[in-house]
Amino acid sequence: MEQLKIRHASAMPAPTWRWLHMNDTEICLPAELVRTGDVEIEAADELLNTAVTFEGAVAGLQERVDAARAGAPDTRACLRAALGADDAEAACGALSDLDVPALSAYQERAAREEAAGDVARAFETGIGTDARSYLNFAAGETVTIATGAGAEGRACVRVNGGAGTTVASSIDAVAAPDSTLSLTITLDAAGDGGSGGQQGAAGVVGSELRVFAGARSRVDVTVYVTADSGFTALDDSGYVLDEGARVQVRHIVLGGGTTATGMAADLRSDTARLDIDTRYLAAGTEVRDFNYVVRHRGKRTVSNIIANGVLAGASKKCLRGTIDLVHGCKGSEGTERETVLIADEGVDNKTVPTILCDEDDVAGNHGATIGHVRPEQLFYLESRGVSPEAAEALFIRAKLEDAALCAPDERIRAAVVRLGDRLIDGFAEELEGDAA
């Protein structure tokens, strides 16, 4: 089967040892898929009939950033090393060769980005440029959802995949100052199932999302991935937060043979806050890949990356979480924490939390808790008539039941129940019995 390959996807900003095979991933997509447009957008007319653009919102922020930077040149020696002698002397004044440090490729790139202070050029998404181009092409057009100043809005985007097709949405969400926006995205596809993994992909569902959270706005984004195991799901997003913005992101990844979830955020202005809550499940030979990059640029900014998941069968998961405390973000704090339950010996689990720091008076915290079902626990359950397969199903059922009970509408709940029936015999009946 001929394939398209997205190489170096979901790449870490500062790579670690290559032999760990965690710096990035390669996404394989069937080349012969038909591009279709089965995307439903449920939103009030005032959210869709707008002249507001993501680029315009970023340009407005750029004006304020430039005004704040005026008259305060950055004279650090690392900029001389990154910019070169001529540009650096103009920006920083003359320095001797002994004052110029040696920089890694990442440090040089970061220093140039800081010197430019260009919000638009610094914008990024979690999976990367190639995935963004693929999803935008598959979507055909980008739809803007925007709130007015001080207004409240709610929208739902449903991406419905099918065998032999590529279906994707491309959404720009712009929350005006002091407004509230709630956005739900579902990536769902029901098919013949397949064996999971990239080789058996029956189709692709995806979402490309750009979010601008205006000053003091409140943005809530929830993404449900409930595709059957024969499908590949791509969830790529990038966020820009203005002063005092509060953004809550929930990623609930329950299905899909191969899923790639990538998110990058620019906490550009002071006192912005970002909270990420990720919940995932993988069974059989399914693959889960996550990449989170949070750049703290404003003062007293806060971020939290919290992940919780269950891995069963011969599934694989890699989670990369990078918190970048950029020069100038004094008083900021970033935290990343993961809890994963490994229900089978065949699981391949990788987690690489990373804290990058170029500022003092900041805090970066990270940790991971990995729980195994110990042999003596399985022996105890077997002595009570519970087989290892039934014990594994208990953990899977708990994750699915939580997702079904918390689903925001009946269609999402039905998709979760469909996945449950595929993994566990009689899941729907037991769930209805518990609800009764």
Where are these regions (language model features)?
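Long, low-complexity, mixed-charge
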Residues: M1-A138
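Conserved beta-strand/loop scaffold segments within soluble protein domains that form the structured core
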Residues: E2-A9, R35, A90, A94-L98, ...
